[in-house]
C-alpha cells in the first residue's frame, strides 16, 4: 500500500505519531521520525518500525523553529532521496480558562501546533513540487470545531490548521499534492490520561475513547493512492462526538 514511499512524521516518539509511524512501516513505507526531546522513546519506535523490514531513522527537531525544520528536511532528503508523505502531528496543550491563561502558554501552543505545521509544510513544499507528488496530513482536533472550554489556545491552533490545510490544498493541487487534515476526538494517549473518562464517554455516541491505531488507520488511507481524489478535507475521527 505504501511500499517505496518515504514518510516524515513529527511528534513520532509516542501516542498518535508513533502509531502512524508503525502503521506506515507495516504498509511498506520508509519512515523519518521527528522528536523534540525524548530520544529514547523515538529510538524504541525506530526499532519497532525497522522490524517491518523498512528503513527508519530518527531526527531531533523543534517544529516551532523554522531553522530546525529546514535542517531536518534537508537531512532526510539526503538520507532517503525524497519525501512522499508528511504528517504534521507534533502538538502540545497548556489548558486553562481564558481569564487565567498566561500569554506564554497561548504563544507556546500556537507556535508548536500551528506555526510548527506551517514550518514543516514550507520546508517540504519544494520537494513535493519537484517530484510532482505529495501527501500532507495535518493533525487537527475536534476542539477546533467545538471550542472546548479551557482550550482557547489549543482550539485556535487546531482551527488554524484546518484553514491552512484548505489554503495549501488549493495552492498545491496543480502539482499533484493532496493536503488533508484529521480531527481526532478523545484518543487514549498521554495527552488525555488525566481527563475524567466516565464523563467523556457520556458525550461520545460510540461509548469509547479512540485509540492511536484508529487515527493511524485513517492516516494510512490519506497517505495511500486510495485518497488521490481527496484534498482540502478535514475528517473527524471522534466516535460521533462532534455530530
Tell what function each PLM region has:
Residues 126, 170-174, 228:
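Alpha-helical segment proximal to the catalytic Tyr-Lys
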Residues 6, 13-14:
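Conserved glycine-rich cofactor-binding loop
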Residues 121, 157, 165:
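Active-site helix of classical SDR
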Amino acid at each position: 500500500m505504501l511500499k517505496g514511499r518515504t514518510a516524515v512524521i513529527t511528534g513520532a516518539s509516542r501516542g498518535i505519531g508513533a502509531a502512524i509511524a508503525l502503521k506506515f512501516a507495516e504498509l511498506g513505507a520508509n519512515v523519518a521520525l521527528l522528536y523534540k526531546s525524548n530520544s529514547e522513546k523515538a529510538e524504541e519506535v525506530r526499532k519497532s518500525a525497522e522490524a517491518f523490514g523498512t528503513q527508519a531513522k530518527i531526527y531531533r527537531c523543534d517544529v516551532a523553529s523554522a531553522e530546525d525544520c529546514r535542517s531536518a528536511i534537508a537531512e532526510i532528503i539526503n538520507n532517503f532521496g525524497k519525501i512522499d508523505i508528511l504528517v504534521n502531528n507534533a502538538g502540545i496543550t497548556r489548558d486553562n480558562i481564558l481569564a487565567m491563561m498566561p500569554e506564554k502558554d497561548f504563544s507556546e501552543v500556537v507556535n508548536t501546533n500551528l506555526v510548527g505545521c506551517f514550518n514543516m509544510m514550507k520546508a517540504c513544499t519544494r520537494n513535493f513540487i519537484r517530484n510532482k507528488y505529495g501527501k500532507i496530513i495535518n493533525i487537527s482536533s475536534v476542539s477546533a470545531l467545538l471550542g472546548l472550554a479551557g482550550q482557547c489556545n489549543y482550539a485556535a491552533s487546531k482551527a488554524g490548521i484546518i484553514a491552512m490545510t484548505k489554503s495549501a490544498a488549493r495552492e498545491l493541487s496543480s502539482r499533484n499534492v493532496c493536503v488533508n487534515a484529521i480531527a481526532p476526538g478523545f484518543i487514549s494517549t498521554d495527552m488525555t490520561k488525566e481527563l475524567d473518562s466516565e464523563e467523556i464517554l457520556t458525550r461520545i455516541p460510540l461509548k469509547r475513547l479512540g485509540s492511536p491505531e484508529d487515527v493511524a488507520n485513517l492516516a494510512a488511507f490519506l497517505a495511500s493512492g486510495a485518497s488521490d481524489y481527496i484534498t482540502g478535507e478535514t475528517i473527524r475521527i471522534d466516535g460521533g462526538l462532534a455530530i
